[in-house]
Amino acid sequence: MKYLCLIYDEESKLAAMPKDEADAFMGGYFAFTEQLRAAGQYVAGEALHPVHTATTVRIRGGRLATTDGPFAETREQLGGFYLVEARDLNEALQIAARIPSAHTGTIEVRPVVDFGQPDANAAALKATAEPARTV
């Protein structure tokens, strides 16, 4: 089953990191990505440009409205994602806990709806209705 790991972090904290610390942080991402690939769990992953480059799109009353910046003003902003293959939610949470930004920000894990596998979707929705797990 596929899970999307949304990576939220404070851009200002990352930008303020000394170069050697930032290099080590990014090195952690490169190593993590290679571990996922080697385990056959990597589907996709990308970093996003800084939040000031975002544009929000809405249609209200049939009219297109765009706004510079993200949808919400929060300290942590969406900075990237991994799409991973995991047996179940518990395994996806274990994968998410290894993402470097789990130490500096927040990782949101969500099951991905696969329109080609309705039975898998039902199992994922049932699993998400259960109490939260600890990793």
Predicted regions and their residues:
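Conserved, structured core segments of small domains
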Residues: 1-135
